[in-house]
Design a protein with these regions (language model features):
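Histidine-dependent nucleotide/RNA phosphoesterase domain, centered on the 2H-phosphoesterase fold
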Residues: 1-184
């Protein structure tokens, strides 16, 4: 845990699969060619497994324990880009989840964290994706998705710090609090 964080402080947390550097570089190049607006910076690209929201810092050891055990029991994950779609506020690349392994990892985290009272399941179905663009007004882009796939070998707990967005900057900065190798 960051040294400057007190036990009673609230942390905006999420658990995610980190992308390998070659995939991050390829996606950043694709974003520069195909997207316009507030693109997600390369250092913020990830596949969210569980968004926990604002949690007391004292819960972090329990959350990290759940992530560590789940990651140890999972194998490295094969993810492939299948398309681009937009929701009300984000553009995302959807991913094929080989053999449902990523969905199984997400489901395990959701169930265990929910049982511990540190997570509330979202109403919508979990979808493996990488958020690549944020917007206030849906641009209705139709970019050709990149032909890209990768193996991801670790999962991490992230701290999300919100800042007012500017035309050149994203509204959030993410900090890895801890990461765990998939398969131990």
């Amino acid at each position: 845990m960051a040294a400057s964080v007190g036990r009673d402080e609230r942390l905006r947390l999420f658990l995610a699969i980190r992308l390998p550097e070659p995939a991050v570089e390829a996606l950043a190049g694709w974003q520069a060619r195909e997207l316009h607006g507030r693109v997600v910076p390369p250092e913020n690209l990830h596949v969210t497994l569980a968004f926990l929201g604002s949690r007391p810092a004292g819960e972090l050891p329990v959350i990290l324990g759940v992530l560590e055990r789940a990651a140890a029991d999972a194998a490295p994950l094969r993810l492939d880009v299948t398309g681009y779609r937009e929701s009300r506020s984000v553009g995302m690349l959807t991913l094929a989840d080989e053999a449902g392994a990523t969905a199984a990892l997400a489901e395990r985290l959701h169930a265990e964290l929910e049982q511990l009272g540190v997570y509330r399941r979202e109403a919508r179905r979990w979808l493996p994706h990488v958020t690549v663009l944020r917007f206030r007004e849906r641009p209705r882009l139709r970019p050709e998705p990149p032909s890209l796939g990768w193996m991801s070998s670790d999962a991490a707990a992230f701290l999300s710090r919100l800042h007012p967005p500017s035309p050149a900057a994203t509204a959030a900065r993410y900090e890895v609090l801890d990461s765990f190798r998939l398969g131990g």
